[in-house]
């Protein structure tokens, strides 16, 4: 099954997440199909905290991809 989930990056105590479309059987930071956005929970000032490619997310959900709980919350908050 294909899932859209977060892959952690960044430094110690300074997380940065990429929203990845990947096969559920692959590791979280392993092989992926496509990157559809990013989430920076520690964004300050002019930094962009969240960017989502909603067209690609809708495409993958239409193809049967599942959203992880955290990604579903981010998508819901971004679409307000």
From Swiss-Prot:
Belongs to the bacterial ribosomal protein bS16 family. Coiled coil: none annotated. GO terms for molecular function: structural constituent of ribosome. Keywords: Ribonucleoprotein, Ribosomal protein. GO terms for biological process: translation. This is Small ribosomal subunit protein bS16. It holds the Pfam family Ribosomal_S16. Gene3D superfamilies: 3.30.1320.10. GO terms for cellular component: cytoplasm; small ribosomal subunit. InterPro entries: Ribosomal_bS16, Ribosomal_bS16_CS, Ribosomal_bS16_dom_sf.
């Amino acid at each position: 099954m294909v899932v859209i989930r977060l892959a952690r990056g960044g430094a110690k105590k300074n997380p940065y997440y990429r929203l990845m479309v990947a096969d559920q059987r692959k590791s979280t930071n392993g092989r992926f199909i496509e990157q559809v956005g990013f989430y920076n929970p520690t964004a300050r000032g002019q930094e962009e905290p969240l960017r989502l490619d909603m067209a690609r997310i809708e495409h993958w959900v239409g193809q049967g991809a599942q959203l992880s709980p955290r990604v579903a919350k981010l998508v819901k908050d971004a679409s307000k």
